[in-house]
Amino acid sequence: MEKIKLIILLFSLTVFSQSDSPITDDFKSIEKIADSLFKNKNFMEATNYYEKLVKAMPNDFDYSFKYAGSYGLYVESLPRLQQVKHIRQMIKRFETAFNLKKDDIEINRALLEIYLRVPRFFGGGNKKAKMILDNIYSVSLEEGKKSELFYNSF
């Protein structure tokens, strides 16, 4: 009886110790599929795959940023009246990625543009854009100057 317990214990340990690798491989496979869909401009399908990754790993900046970007491009491809339904959700996704890595220039530039283009009523506005501009300056003086030119052109 002790031998059976030992065998079961060893078997379960080997099964659980190997479980990390397939999960990581699954994430990489899902990411490759999503990236491929994104490159082919199938933004809604890519968003669905990125969403799975974000739900599994909510603190991963890359997945959150790709999720926000693909959703944003999907929303941008919609007719104006349909865009209205999705704007707040799009902004929320970008803000989630921003909160994970505030010093990333790409997410800062994306949010700056979104806040400048989207009316305050929908979650945008100059006040939020100015906050992002200040954050960009704190990360990089050169990028801050470029972003300020963009900010002033709006």
How should each PLM-predicted stretch be described?
Residues 4-14:
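Sec-dependent N-terminal signal peptides
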Residues 24, 58, 102-103, 140-141:
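Short coil turns that delineate tetratricopeptide repeat
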Residues 53, 96-97, 135-136:
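Canonical positions in the second alpha-helix
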Residues 63, 107, 145-146:
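TPR alpha-solenoid repeat register
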Residues 68, 73-82, 113-123, 153-154:
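Short coil/turn linking the two alpha-helices of tandem helical-hairpin repeats
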